[in-house]
Amino acid sequence: MALGITIEEAPRLFAIEVAGDLDLGSIPGLHDALQKATLTTCPDVALDLDGLTSIDDAALGILHGALRRLNRVGRRIWIVCNLTALIDRLERAGILDSAEVAASRHDIASH
C-alpha cells in the first residue's frame, strides 16, 4: 500500500496523518511534511500513525532524526497511536525519547 500523508494546521497544532506503508521508498514524503512542521509557528506537532500498515527500520531511523530536529526548534512532538505493537517498536527504537504518546488529537488539545 502506498503512503498517504495529510497535513492539517491549526493555531496551536500542526498535524501530520500517515496511512499505508512507511519504508525507505516512501520516507521522502514524510520528510517533506516534517520539514514543513519545523517552519510552522505551531508549538505542538502531532504525527498520527494509526493508519500505518508497516514501518521498516530505515524509516524508523529517519523518523527519529526528524523528531529530534523538531525538538531542537522548540516543537513539542506528539505521536498519535493506539497500536500497542507499534508503540512498543517506537519505544525500543528510542523515538519516544523525543515525543509523547496520545490516543487522539483531542487528547493533545486538553494538555
Walk through the language-model features, giving the residues of each:
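STAS-like cytosolic regulatory interaction modules
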Residues: 1-111
